[in-house]
Amino acid sequence: MSVHTTKRRLSPASIESLKGDRPIVSLTAYTTPIARLLDPHVDFLLVGDSLGMVLYGLDTTVGVTLDMMIAHGQAVMRGSERCCVVVDLPFGAYQESKEQAFRSAARILKETGCSAVKLEGGAEMAETVEFLVSRGIPVLGHVGLMPQLVNTTGGYRSVGRNEKEVAKIRRDAKAIDDAGAFAIVVEGTVEPVAREITATLRAPTIGIGASPACDGQILVSDDMLGLFNDFKPRFVKHFAELAPAISKAVEDYANEVKARTFPGIEHTFQVKR
Protein backbone atom coordinates (compact mmCIF):
# COMPACT_ATOMS: atom_id res chain seq x y z
CA MET A 1 0.00 0.00 0.00
CA SER A 2 1.37 3.40 -0.92
CA VAL A 3 1.98 6.04 1.73
CA HIS A 4 0.67 9.41 0.50
CA THR A 5 0.54 12.87 2.02
CA THR A 6 -1.75 15.74 1.11
CA LYS A 7 0.80 18.56 1.07
CA ARG A 8 2.74 19.33 -2.09
CA ARG A 9 6.30 18.03 -2.00
CA LEU A 10 9.40 19.26 -3.73
CA SER A 11 9.77 17.27 -6.94
CA PRO A 12 12.81 15.96 -8.81
CA ALA A 13 12.23 18.81 -11.29
CA SER A 14 12.33 21.26 -8.36
CA ILE A 15 15.70 19.85 -7.30
CA GLU A 16 17.04 20.06 -10.85
CA SER A 17 15.95 23.70 -11.16
CA LEU A 18 18.09 24.70 -8.16
CA LYS A 19 21.31 24.37 -10.17
CA GLY A 20 22.84 27.81 -10.44
CA ASP A 21 20.35 29.22 -7.94
CA ARG A 22 21.49 28.02 -4.50
CA PRO A 23 23.20 24.98 -2.94
CA ILE A 24 21.02 21.88 -2.62
CA VAL A 25 20.70 20.39 0.87
CA SER A 26 20.30 16.65 1.37
CA LEU A 27 20.73 14.00 4.05
CA THR A 28 19.99 10.31 4.41
CA ALA A 29 17.01 9.10 6.43
CA TYR A 30 15.86 5.58 7.22
CA THR A 31 13.16 5.96 9.89
CA THR A 32 10.01 7.96 10.54
CA PRO A 33 11.26 9.96 13.57
CA ILE A 34 14.46 11.06 11.85
CA ALA A 35 12.62 11.94 8.63
CA ARG A 36 10.24 14.10 10.66
CA LEU A 37 13.17 16.02 12.18
CA LEU A 38 15.05 16.48 8.90
CA ASP A 39 12.12 17.27 6.61
CA PRO A 40 11.85 21.04 7.32
CA HIS A 41 15.52 21.67 6.59
CA VAL A 42 16.42 19.66 3.47
CA ASP A 43 15.51 19.70 -0.21
CA PHE A 44 15.53 15.93 -0.52
CA LEU A 45 15.97 12.92 1.71
CA LEU A 46 17.78 9.85 0.41
CA VAL A 47 16.74 6.48 1.76
CA GLY A 48 20.19 5.13 1.08
CA ASP A 49 21.35 1.54 0.98
CA SER A 50 23.88 2.76 3.53
CA LEU A 51 21.17 1.66 5.97
CA GLY A 52 22.68 -1.80 5.68
CA MET A 53 25.81 -0.59 7.45
CA VAL A 54 24.25 2.14 9.62
CA LEU A 55 21.20 0.27 10.93
CA TYR A 56 21.95 -3.40 10.36
CA GLY A 57 25.67 -3.59 11.03
CA LEU A 58 26.62 -5.01 7.63
CA ASP A 59 30.19 -4.55 6.40
CA THR A 60 29.07 -3.25 2.99
CA THR A 61 25.86 -2.24 1.22
CA VAL A 62 25.87 -5.38 -0.94
CA GLY A 63 23.64 -7.35 1.44
CA VAL A 64 20.77 -4.86 1.34
CA THR A 65 17.56 -6.15 -0.29
CA LEU A 66 14.76 -4.50 -2.24
CA ASP A 67 12.29 -5.36 0.51
CA MET A 68 14.48 -3.56 3.06
CA MET A 69 14.61 -0.45 0.90
CA ILE A 70 10.84 -0.43 0.42
CA ALA A 71 10.14 -0.84 4.14
CA HIS A 72 12.42 2.06 5.04
CA GLY A 73 11.14 4.13 2.13
CA GLN A 74 7.63 3.77 3.53
CA ALA A 75 8.86 4.82 6.98
CA VAL A 76 10.56 7.96 5.63
CA MET A 77 7.49 8.91 3.60
CA ARG A 78 5.38 8.69 6.74
CA GLY A 79 7.72 11.04 8.55
CA SER A 80 8.10 13.69 5.84
CA GLU A 81 5.69 15.97 4.04
CA ARG A 82 7.53 18.71 2.12
CA CYS A 83 10.88 17.39 0.86
CA CYS A 84 11.51 15.16 -2.13
CA VAL A 85 12.21 11.54 -1.14
CA VAL A 86 14.56 9.34 -3.18
CA VAL A 87 15.07 5.62 -2.53
CA ASP A 88 18.20 3.68 -3.50
CA LEU A 89 18.00 0.72 -5.84
CA PRO A 90 20.04 -1.91 -3.95
CA PHE A 91 22.74 -4.12 -5.40
CA GLY A 92 21.29 -6.88 -7.57
CA ALA A 93 17.97 -5.11 -8.17
CA TYR A 94 18.90 -3.34 -11.42
CA GLN A 95 22.23 -4.46 -12.87
CA GLU A 96 20.93 -7.50 -14.76
CA SER A 97 18.92 -5.54 -17.34
CA LYS A 98 17.05 -2.31 -17.87
CA GLU A 99 13.82 -4.28 -17.63
CA GLN A 100 14.81 -5.60 -14.20
CA ALA A 101 15.66 -2.06 -13.16
CA PHE A 102 12.24 -0.84 -14.27
CA ARG A 103 10.42 -3.57 -12.35
CA SER A 104 12.39 -2.80 -9.18
CA ALA A 105 12.04 0.97 -9.53
CA ALA A 106 8.32 0.79 -10.32
CA ARG A 107 7.77 -1.36 -7.25
CA ILE A 108 9.62 1.18 -5.08
CA LEU A 109 7.58 4.11 -6.39
CA LYS A 110 4.25 2.27 -6.12
CA GLU A 111 4.80 0.78 -2.66
CA THR A 112 6.45 3.77 -0.98
CA GLY A 113 5.01 6.80 -2.77
CA CYS A 114 8.50 8.29 -3.15
CA SER A 115 9.42 10.58 -6.04
CA ALA A 116 12.54 8.97 -7.53
CA VAL A 117 15.14 6.23 -7.30
CA LYS A 118 18.92 6.37 -7.17
CA LEU A 119 21.27 3.98 -8.85
CA GLU A 120 25.04 3.68 -8.96
CA GLY A 121 26.93 3.42 -12.22
CA GLY A 122 28.46 5.34 -15.06
CA ALA A 123 28.45 4.91 -18.82
CA GLU A 124 27.52 1.24 -18.49
CA MET A 125 24.25 2.23 -16.75
CA ALA A 126 23.32 5.13 -19.04
CA GLU A 127 20.96 3.03 -21.16
CA THR A 128 19.18 1.89 -18.00
CA VAL A 129 18.82 5.46 -16.72
CA GLU A 130 17.40 6.59 -20.06
CA PHE A 131 15.02 3.60 -20.09
CA LEU A 132 13.68 4.50 -16.63
CA VAL A 133 13.38 8.23 -17.27
CA SER A 134 11.58 7.71 -20.57
CA ARG A 135 9.03 5.57 -18.72
CA GLY A 136 8.25 8.08 -16.02
CA ILE A 137 10.74 7.17 -13.30
CA PRO A 138 13.01 10.05 -12.22
CA VAL A 139 16.58 8.93 -11.52
CA LEU A 140 19.29 10.30 -9.25
CA GLY A 141 22.64 9.18 -10.66
CA HIS A 142 25.75 8.25 -8.67
CA VAL A 143 29.33 8.40 -10.01
CA GLY A 144 32.84 8.53 -8.59
CA LEU A 145 33.30 6.20 -5.63
CA MET A 146 30.57 3.57 -5.85
CA PRO A 147 30.07 1.63 -2.59
CA GLN A 148 28.16 -1.21 -4.27
CA LEU A 149 31.31 -2.02 -6.28
CA VAL A 150 33.63 -2.12 -3.28
CA ASN A 151 34.32 -5.84 -3.80
CA THR A 152 35.78 -5.18 -7.26
CA THR A 153 37.34 -1.74 -6.81
CA GLY A 154 39.46 -2.59 -3.78
CA GLY A 155 37.76 -0.64 -1.02
CA TYR A 156 36.66 2.85 -0.05
CA ARG A 157 39.10 5.41 -1.42
CA SER A 158 38.85 8.72 -3.20
CA VAL A 159 38.96 8.68 -7.00
CA GLY A 160 40.24 11.03 -9.69
CA ARG A 161 43.90 10.88 -8.69
CA ASN A 162 45.24 9.73 -12.06
CA GLU A 163 44.41 10.36 -15.72
CA LYS A 164 42.59 7.06 -16.15
CA GLU A 165 40.28 7.74 -13.20
CA VAL A 166 39.66 11.33 -14.30
CA ALA A 167 38.71 10.19 -17.80
CA LYS A 168 36.32 7.59 -16.37
CA ILE A 169 34.56 10.08 -14.08
CA ARG A 170 34.17 12.56 -16.95
CA ARG A 171 32.77 9.85 -19.21
CA ASP A 172 30.46 8.45 -16.53
CA ALA A 173 29.09 11.82 -15.45
CA LYS A 174 28.39 12.95 -19.02
CA ALA A 175 26.70 9.66 -19.89
CA ILE A 176 24.37 9.78 -16.88
CA ASP A 177 23.67 13.46 -17.51
CA ASP A 178 22.84 12.81 -21.16
CA ALA A 179 20.60 9.90 -20.10
CA GLY A 180 18.35 12.32 -18.22
CA ALA A 181 19.18 12.01 -14.52
CA PHE A 182 17.66 14.94 -12.60
CA ALA A 183 20.78 15.15 -10.39
CA ILE A 184 23.99 13.18 -9.88
CA VAL A 185 25.68 12.21 -6.62
CA VAL A 186 29.46 12.60 -6.91
CA GLU A 187 31.18 10.62 -4.17
CA GLY A 188 34.78 10.52 -2.97
CA THR A 189 36.09 12.60 -5.87
CA VAL A 190 38.99 15.05 -5.77
CA GLU A 191 38.07 18.74 -5.92
CA PRO A 192 39.38 19.69 -9.41
CA VAL A 193 37.41 16.89 -11.06
CA ALA A 194 34.25 17.62 -9.07
CA ARG A 195 34.52 21.29 -10.00
CA GLU A 196 35.02 20.50 -13.69
CA ILE A 197 32.05 18.16 -14.08
CA THR A 198 29.81 20.46 -12.02
CA ALA A 199 30.56 23.27 -14.47
CA THR A 200 29.88 21.14 -17.55
CA LEU A 201 26.82 19.07 -16.62
CA ARG A 202 23.19 20.04 -17.11
CA ALA A 203 22.14 18.19 -13.96
CA PRO A 204 23.16 19.46 -10.52
CA THR A 205 25.90 17.55 -8.73
CA ILE A 206 25.40 16.45 -5.13
CA GLY A 207 28.72 16.00 -3.39
CA ILE A 208 29.68 13.59 -0.64
CA GLY A 209 33.39 13.84 -0.09
CA ALA A 210 33.62 15.79 -3.35
CA SER A 211 34.39 19.34 -2.15
CA PRO A 212 32.20 22.47 -1.95
CA ALA A 213 32.45 22.84 -5.73
CA CYS A 214 29.35 20.68 -6.21
CA ASP A 215 25.86 22.11 -6.62
CA GLY A 216 24.76 20.55 -3.33
CA GLN A 217 25.85 18.31 -0.49
CA ILE A 218 24.67 15.10 1.13
CA LEU A 219 25.86 13.26 4.22
CA VAL A 220 24.76 10.18 6.11
CA SER A 221 22.70 11.74 8.89
CA ASP A 222 24.06 9.36 11.53
CA ASP A 223 27.59 10.47 10.63
CA MET A 224 26.96 14.21 10.83
CA LEU A 225 25.04 13.78 14.10
CA GLY A 226 28.05 12.09 15.70
CA LEU A 227 26.43 8.73 16.41
CA PHE A 228 29.61 6.76 15.67
CA ASN A 229 32.62 7.29 17.94
CA ASP A 230 34.90 4.85 16.12
CA PHE A 231 34.25 5.91 12.52
CA LYS A 232 34.65 9.37 11.01
CA PRO A 233 35.56 9.75 7.33
CA ARG A 234 37.67 12.78 6.47
CA PHE A 235 34.80 14.44 4.60
CA VAL A 236 32.39 14.21 7.55
CA LYS A 237 31.85 17.03 10.04
CA HIS A 238 30.11 16.27 13.32
CA PHE A 239 27.42 18.94 13.70
CA ALA A 240 26.49 17.28 17.00
CA GLU A 241 28.01 14.67 19.33
CA LEU A 242 25.01 12.47 20.05
CA ALA A 243 26.89 9.26 20.87
CA PRO A 244 28.24 10.48 24.24
CA ALA A 245 24.93 12.24 25.00
CA ILE A 246 22.99 9.02 24.41
CA SER A 247 25.49 6.99 26.42
CA LYS A 248 25.19 9.42 29.34
CA ALA A 249 21.38 9.37 29.19
CA VAL A 250 21.31 5.57 29.30
CA GLU A 251 23.82 5.52 32.16
CA ASP A 252 21.65 7.96 34.13
CA TYR A 253 18.55 5.86 33.43
CA ALA A 254 20.27 2.67 34.57
CA ASN A 255 21.52 4.32 37.77
CA GLU A 256 18.06 5.67 38.63
CA VAL A 257 16.40 2.31 38.02
CA LYS A 258 18.94 0.58 40.27
CA ALA A 259 18.48 3.26 42.94
CA ARG A 260 14.67 3.03 42.62
CA THR A 261 14.45 6.77 41.98
CA PHE A 262 12.83 6.11 38.61
CA PRO A 263 9.96 5.91 38.05
CA GLY A 264 9.03 8.71 40.43
CA ILE A 265 5.60 9.67 41.66
CA GLU A 266 5.12 11.94 38.64
CA HIS A 267 5.58 8.92 36.32
CA THR A 268 3.23 6.61 38.24
CA PHE A 269 -0.50 6.04 37.79
CA GLN A 270 -2.47 6.39 41.01
CA VAL A 271 -6.00 5.40 42.00
CA LYS A 272 -8.12 8.52 42.43
CA ARG A 273 -10.13 8.58 45.67
Swiss-Prot record:
Q: Which InterPro entries does the UniProt record give?
A: Pantoate_hydroxy_MeTrfase, Pyrv/PenolPyrv_kinase-like_dom, Pyrv_kinase-like_dom_sf
Q: Give the similarity note.
A: Belongs to the PanB family.
Please list the reactions this protein catalyses: 3-methyl-2-oxobutanoate + (6R)-5,10-methylene-5,6,7,8-tetrahydrofolate + H2O = 2-dehydropantoate + (6S)-5,6,7,8-tetrahydrofolate
Q: Where in the cell is it found?
A: Cytoplasm
Annotated Mg(2+) binding sites: D49, D88, E120
Gene, per the UniProt record:
panB
Q: Can you quote a single GO CC term?
A: cytoplasm
**Gene source species:** Sinorhizobium medicae (strain WSM419) (Ensifer medicae)
The cofactor binding remark recorded in the entry reads: Binds 1 Mg(2+) ion per subunit.
Cofactor(s) this protein cannot do without: Mg(2+)
Q: What is this protein called?
A: 3-methyl-2-oxobutanoate hydroxymethyltransferase
